[in-house]
A protein has these predicted regions:
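A general structural signal for well-ordered alpha-helical segments in protein cores
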Residues: 4, 35-38, 123, 182
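Short acidic alpha-helix initiation/capping motifs at coil-to-helix transition points
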Residues: 1-3, 28-35
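Active-site neighborhood of HAD-like aspartate-dependent phosphohydrolases
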Residues: 1-20, 152
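Short, acidic loop-to-helix structural element flanking the phosphoryl-transfer center
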Residues: 32-44, 49-82, 88-92, 120
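Asp-based, Mg2+/Mn2+-dependent phosphohydrolase catalytic module
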Residues: 71, 87-88, 92-197
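Short linear capping/connector segments at secondary-structure termini
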Residues: 20-26, 54-58, 107-109
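Small-residue helix-packing motif on alpha-helices
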Residues: 18-19, 52, 137
Length: 197
């Protein structure tokens, strides 16, 4: 909602036209790196997209159930890697405004690879870089197409987030195990620590 409004204010285009144009472009680009790319949208709209994101930075926060989940993963000896389709500037803003980085061993923007989590090429490049055992890896995401891509690659443990947006109702997810509150997993994680070889 913020982008069409600001695009209208800064350029004089009607807000309804801005909204319709963006909706059409989002549909074409969904799942592609451009959809997530602040540089692309800055060029396309001739707007300072990173600055506009800062205008709504009060909306950037960690879910309240996330710290306990990530702490349990840390305490259990598991390596925690965050892989996001977000542009590096979006990721930097989140790191600046939340304690997320204190819980994560490695933060990766798919922009480093030029492909998104929806694409098999990304999973191949991640495995080459990180050397993970796909069958023993847990991957958590709120996007069903991304979870399907991870499944196709052979990720052994997949978990869907049924309520990624607190302003929206909980989604019914049948294709994958789903979680509403990460804290529900803490006891099981701590009960099964990783044994170092």
């Amino acid at each position: 909602e913020h982008l069409p409004k600001r695009w209208s204010e800064l350029t004089g285009i009607a807000e309804t036209e801005a909204r319709a144009t963006l909706k059409a472009e989002y549909a074409v680009l969904h799942g592609k790196i451009e959809w997530y790319c602040l540089d692309y949208w800055t060029r396309r709209l001739n707007l300072p997209i990173t600055a506009l994101k800062r205008e709504i930075s009060d909306k950037i926060a960690m879910r309240e159930d996330t710290p306990a989940f990530l702490q349990a993963l840390q305490q259990s000896g598991r390596r925690i890697v965050l892989v996001t389709n977000a542009h590096p500037d979006s990721l930097s803003l989140k790191i600046e405004l939340t304690p997320l980085a204190t819980y994560i061993d490695e933060l990766i923007s798919t922009h480093e690879f030029g492909v998104t989590k929806e694409q098999q090429e990304l999973w191949q490049q991640l495995q080459a870089r990180l050397g993970f055992d796909a069958k023993r890896t847990l991957f958590v995401d709120d996007s069903l197409p991304i979870l399907h891509a991870a499944q196709q690659f052979g990720i052994g443990h997949l978990l869907a987030v049924a309520n990624p947006d607190s302003q929206q109702p909980v989604r019914q997810i049948d294709e994958f195990p789903a979680i509403i509150d990460y804290r529900d997993l803490v006891a099981d994680i701590l009960a099964a620590p990783v044994i170092a070889n």
